[in-house]
Amino acid sequence: MMDQARSAFSNLFGGEPLSYTRFSLARQVDGDNSHVEMKLAVDEEENADNNTKANVTKPKRCGGSICYGTIAVIIFFLIGFMIGYLGYCKGVEPKTECERLAGTESPVREEPEEDFPAAPRLYWDDLKKKLSEKLDTTDFTSTIKLLNENSYVPREAGSQKDENLALYVENQFREFKLSKVWRDQHFVKIQVKDSAQNSVIIVDKNGRLVYLVENPGGYVAYSKAATVTGKLVHANFGTKKDFEDLDTPVNGSIVIVRAGKITFAEKVANAESLNAIGVLIYMDQTKFPIVNAELSFFGHAHLGTGDPYTPGFPSFNHTQFPPSRSSGLPNIPVQTISRAAAEKLFGNMEGDCPSDWKTDSTCRMVTSESKNVKLTVSNVLKEIKILNIFGVIKGFVEPDHYVVVGAQRDAWGPGAAKSGVGTALLLKLAEMFSDMVLKDGFQPSRSIIFASWSAGDFGSVGATEWLEGYLSSLHLKAFTYINLDKAVLGTSNFKVSASPLLYTLIEKTMQNVKHPVTGQSLYQDSNWASKVEKLTLDNAAFPFLAYSGIPAVSFCFCEDTDYPYLGTTMDTYKELTERIPELNKVARAAAEVAGQFMIKLTHDVELNLDYERYNSQLLSFVRDLNQYRADIKEMGLSLQWLYSARGDFFRATSRLTTDFGNAEKTDRFVMKKLNDRVMRVEYHFLSPYVSPKESPFRHVFWGSGSHTLSALLENLKLRKQNNSAFNETLFRNQLALATWTIQGAANALSGDVWDIDNEF
């Protein structure tokens, strides 16, 4: 064919030997077959087999313009012809004439990839059904009972039995084939009873012994070790209002208060702020209907969380931090006493307790003139090693983003309700979710971390130390904490405490889960969000929210009254099953609530955190502040900039909602950027203007300290109620820093710096 083409070309020009162009489409070594190479051959063929030159007669020259035009047309024709011809050769079998003429080697034949069928994607309804099926076949009570056996009871933090249970949890995580299992150890200081007994004694005015009231079996950790003597004054629950309502001053006196309503630490702090010299805490029969009047109980008095001797930094060994002490430690002795001991004290006191206290008829207000009470506390510090145990199911798309599910493991006493139920739920959820991933095709986009904490009884020490140790690693990675502690304390009510970011998720979950006894939906009140209580200091979810800025949720099935045996030696499996006969059903419902949280948070492309909920929180704060607009104006201040910051936050949430609506849900890069903006919201409500060491709970809504919005309002109220106590300089700082914190949250939600509304 090439010879024929050459012959035609030569004849056209009268046989004159001219240059011609060869196009080689040979496949290159690097696999690029689109390269075109041009070569010029003059006077002779590349394959001149006969080695003869063509003898031609020199023709007459044609007109220049006609010749050049004709040449151009023919060249283009030949180019098209050769490209088409060689293109056709690619479609024939290897080693054909076409391939040899093109001068190419046969391409390496690639083995076809085996076509495995893709696992079908599981949707929300599928996953909800699979979770329900697994819950139906799970026996929670046997695990709770196992954790209450002698080998694990009692399991005070740092004890051998606490470690035994830690190793059991670790082995279980490994048996469940989680993606990874590891442990985290800390060296912390706790307070324990000394060999010298604590005591409560009645003495006369000269300090002589009248009689011993009690050598209590329980104690209050982190009490000051001291002996004090003074009159005894009853202050109901020890709230601020209770102290305000008292007719008798408490300065220089020992205060006796009822357990409940607020934490031990808050009771002690309130008493100490009014110069009380000691505190006694008892459980009255009205609120805690326990038959055994001699029952002792345990608690702690640290107004904070974590190791109080390493405030704001982790308790790792050999960290060489200078000696430090939390400002939340009390400077007065504190002791729990039995109801029987309290009644003995009331026998030496005068004045009936107010009827609106709704307490025991034996209650009295103050000791008689001739008698005092002597309190001796001899607790000592002890350094212990604690273990936190972790297991993770890694996400398939965003493994670096994770929800943390945790439960306290230790307990003073048997701890069936306090830590046994939570640990059992943790183990069963880890087993079920691992099974769903390994066998049922569940592919969570984000990771799930299961955490078993130690030293929870001493103020969420294990959880807080982990947060302090890994705060920078957790930032914008851990996006929710689900607390399983004390999830089953009754059957009558379902109560929840959480960050507003989780309210929408909670509402949807309540609509999906049925009450374990009545069979009705947990969602019974459309106004439920207004009744949500703040997370308290004794809740392990609190440091996640207030210290780390991680949205957190804690929930329970419970009664209107407190569970009476928490922190006592009667917190046993036997008492738990007697009070809650349908324990397995209630535990199943608690696991279903937590399980649905976990699925929605790790499965959906859009993060299930409702950032718009904070608009109503900010609006509520501004409304409260507006009541004092005249006072603010008198100080020469304006709320204009606060309004502007609040408006910027509202606009930022609206823009983000629009961005989510316009985003292509299958574009993971875009969705991740949007989700990252959502994850910043809670964190940026941590005040950047206070030290984590001095004020660890920096959240302006849910933390504690002068930087909080509630503290700002409390200070401002004093301008009318008690002007001498009002601190105007403090208020000016509070208002300015609160405004900038809100503005910072709005800026973070806006995204990139060029998207921020800079009119502020």
Curated annotation (Swiss-Prot):
Function: Cellular uptake of iron occurs via receptor-mediated endocytosis of ligand-occupied transferrin receptor into specialized endosomes. Endosomal acidification leads to iron release. The apotransferrin-receptor complex is then recycled to the cell surface with a return to neutral pH and the concomitant loss of affinity of apotransferrin for its receptor. Transferrin receptor is necessary for development of erythrocytes and the nervous system. Positively regulates T and B cell proliferation through iron uptake.
Membrane topology of this protein: Single-pass type II membrane protein
Position of sequence motif Endocytosis signal: 20-23
Residues found modified as Phosphothreonine: T21
Subcellular location: Cell membrane; Melanosome
Modified residues (Phosphotyrosine): Y20
TM region(s), chain numbering: 66-86
BP term (GO), one: intracellular iron ion homeostasis
Annotated lipid attachment (S-palmitoyl cysteine): C62, C67
Alphabetized SUPFAM superfamilies for the sequence: PA domain (SSF52025), Transferrin receptor-like dimerisation domain (SSF47672), Zn-dependent exopeptidases (SSF53187)
Name of the gene: TFRC
Gene Ontology molecular function, alphabetical: transferrin receptor activity
Chief location: membrane
Ranges spanned by the short sequence motif Cell attachment site, renumbered to the chain: 646-648
Similarity comment text for this entry: Belongs to the peptidase M28 family. M28B subfamily.
Keyword Heme: no
Modified residues (Phosphoserine): S10, S19, S24
Gene3D superfamilies (UniProt xref): 3.50.30.30, Transferrin receptor-like, dimerisation domain, Zn peptidases
Posttranslational modification: Stearoylated by ZDHHC6 which inhibits TFRC-mediated activation of the JNK pathway and promotes mitochondrial fragmentation. Stearoylation does not affect iron uptake.
Keywords of the record: Cell membrane, Disulfide bond, Endocytosis, Glycoprotein, Lipoprotein, Membrane, Palmitate, Phosphoprotein, Receptor, Signal-anchor, Transmembrane, Transmembrane helix
Spans within the Extracellular topological domain: 87-760
Motif (Stop-transfer sequence): 58-61
Nucleus as UniProt keyword: no
Organism: Pongo abelii (Sumatran orangutan)
Oligomer and partners: Homodimer; disulfide-linked. Binds one transferrin or HFE molecule per subunit. Interacts with SH3BP4. Interacts with STEAP3; facilitates TFRC endocytosis in erythroid precursor cells.
Descriptive protein name: Transferrin receptor protein 1
